[in-house]
Amino acid sequence: MKLEESLKKCPVIKRGEYNYFVHPITDGIPLVEPSLLREVACRILKIVDFSEVDKIVTAEAMGIHLATTLSLYTDIPFVIIRKRSYGLEGEIPVFQKTGYSKGQLYVNGIKEGDKVVIVDDVISTGGTMIAIIEALKRAGAEIKDIVCVIERGKGREIVEKKTGYKIKTLVKIDVVDGKVVIK
């Protein structure tokens, strides 16, 4: 499959002590091939039931292309959780901490009773996903499903234990000796 093959070839860089893999789905570089994006979207469509979903939710920035593609396939609108405040009525700020950064995220466009699917590019430490889940619960949304394209580390387990929500992923990886390894 294109996703797994492309992951095996992607470069790994250091961000402090964190080994960061650079991939089109997670970083938008070097080039996002339509065939790769299509494969990822079709694989998500096979494992997530969108039939009772009002909104697709993703975090800025690298979930945007995934949410856009899924929105086009399903005709379901999507909401982007942003890294800056717009000060709109009902905006929900939430603190996010990842393996290499921390800061505020801002949720707009979600109202009580919305049925949502969360889509993201990668789950690694679980920090972003926990923040998103907590914000959506505060907004009164019903989380129908959660899917991340790439699973790395213990983030999925941490999120599931802390929130009770199951996380679906397409591929599990690790970084060993400066290379991505499919598990």
Swiss-Prot record:
Protein origin, superkingdom: Archaea
UniProt pathway annotation: Purine metabolism; IMP biosynthesis via salvage pathway; IMP from hypoxanthine: step 1/1
Recorded catalytic activity of this chain's protein: IMP + diphosphate = hypoxanthine + 5-phospho-alpha-D-ribose 1-diphosphate; GMP + diphosphate = guanine + 5-phospho-alpha-D-ribose 1-diphosphate
Pfam families cross-referenced by the UniProt entry: Pribosyltran
Cellular component terms (Gene Ontology): cytoplasm
Keywords attached to this entry: Cytoplasm, Glycosyltransferase, Purine salvage, Transferase
Keyword Manganese: no
Family: Belongs to the purine/pyrimidine phosphoribosyltransferase family. Archaeal HPRT subfamily.
Subunit annotation: Homodimer.
Protein name in the entry: Hypoxanthine/guanine phosphoribosyltransferase
Organism: Methanocaldococcus infernus (strain DSM 11812 / JCM 15783 / ME)
Lineage: Archaea, Methanobacteriati, Methanobacteriota, Methanomada group, Methanococci
Name of the gene this protein is made from: hpt
